[in-house]
Amino acid sequence: MQAIILAAGMGKRLGNLTQNNTKCMVEVGGVRLIERALYILDKKNLSRIVMVVGYQCENLMQFVDGLGIDTPVEYIINEVYDRTNNIYSLSMAKDWLVKEDTLLLESDLIFEEALIDLLLEDSRETLALVDKFENWMDGTCLVVDEDDRIVDFIPGKLLEYSQKERYYKTVNIYKLSADFSRNVYVPFLEAYARVMGNNEYYEAVIKLILMLDKNTMRAKRLEGQRWYEIDDIQDLDIAEVLFAADAGERYKKLTSRYGGYWRFPHLKDFCYLVNPYFPPARMMEELKSNFDILVRQYPSGMRVNCLLAAKTFGISEEHIV
């Protein structure tokens, strides 16, 4: 088993944090993303770790070489990182991909070691790691059946939020057997890139393969293990909370936010002062029913609002200020 890490991107949405370094060099809790990932992978007795690098690659390679991990690291340099996407980076690693079973992951992830163990301990050869869809997630989503078959790939722009209970999110960590890579994935990857170009995503190739044969890959579902994808400074801020060094530090970071805890779906807040009777169910139903109109139309002026308030509270308009 080997690992391939895609780390060529520029991470523009992180602004100044990636001005002189690639995205995987940003820190969460004082530890760089790539450092955390490599130390986890180094424990798994892998034959090698292949990194496809591009933007600010000299800084990245120098840093990785200085970590002193035991697993050999091979580098592939994507010189055209600024005008290609991850399908091109992965195609550059195809000769490694067909050699042996592979853990494929993207470098902008922060995750628990348990995620890697889930894939390694599962006897199934080709797996996509997935998590139940939550409101903070974006990007490609999946529909998974009771046998863990991936029955649909849904691009982020086509998500129907009314159907979100059916969705799973790709974590962007995969286990690919050498046989699957050699006989299925790489041939499709090459053909897809020839037709569609190199500014595409490798997930599109997986979607195409599964449209033809849903048995080539299964979904491996997470069960509460922590992970986060770092695309912008808000992601980074949330990851600082999720991956705080200990419970005390996590508590400090959470309480300093003074709300907005819906961004942490599994958090139970026992301190926030709320009125449990408001809003009543009837009011919520009416708001939902009129939501489209409320969003699209502009409100009445002050005179009409004073009139409505006077009617609601049973007082004269002159007493509304």
Q: Positions of the model-derived regions?
A:
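Conserved alpha/beta core of the MobA/IspD/sugar-nucleotide pyrophosphorylase nucleotidyltransferase superfamily
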Residues: M1-A3, Y167-H266
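Catalytic metal- and UDP-sugar-binding loop of GT-A-like glycosyltransferases, i.e.
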Residues: L6, L105, F270
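Acidic donor-binding segment of Leloir-type glycosyltransferases
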Residues: Y55-E74
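Conserved beta-loop-beta/alpha segment of the NTase-like Rossmann-fold superfamily
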Residues: G68-E146
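Short loop-beta-helix segment that forms the pyridoxal 5′-phosphate
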Residues: P299, A309-V321
